[in-house]
UniProtKB/Swiss-Prot annotation:
Family to which the UniProt record says this protein belongs: Belongs to the bacterial ribosomal protein bL27 family.
Name used for this protein in its record: Large ribosomal subunit protein bL27
Lineage, highest ranks first: Bacteria, Pseudomonadati, Pseudomonadota, Alphaproteobacteria, Hyphomicrobiales
GO molecular function, one term: structural constituent of ribosome
Disulfide bridge positions per record: none
Length: 91
């Protein structure tokens, strides 16, 4: 049994790269179907209308339109995509 640790080894130096999470398309931005809106761990943001959710909780646009963020009375943040016709009516 060795009484001294073998040289040439390092216990440090394992700082992994960031995962590139966060909002990719902000409120008011135009998106087309399939565009990623948010990459997240867990559901910080929930899918609203015309937004799908992937198995890793990525939110993506199901149709073309404008991104819309809102917080509902239950305290959850929702992201929706408003189609072009509805977006004009909302303005």
């Amino acid at each position: 049994m060795a009484h001294k640790k073998a040289g040439g080894s390092s216990r440090n130096g394992r700082d992994s790269d960031g995962r590139r999470l966060g909002v990719k398309k902000f409120g008011g931005e135009a998106v087309i179907g399939g565009n990623i809106i948010v990459r997240q761990r867990g559901t910080k943001w929930h899918p609203g209308s015309n937004v799908g959710i992937g198995k890793d909780h990525t939110l993506f646009a199901l149709t073309a339109g404008q991104v819309f963020f809102q917080t509902k009375a239950n305290g959850r943040s929702y992201i929706s995509v408003i189609p072009p016709k509805a977006a004009e009516a909302a303005e």
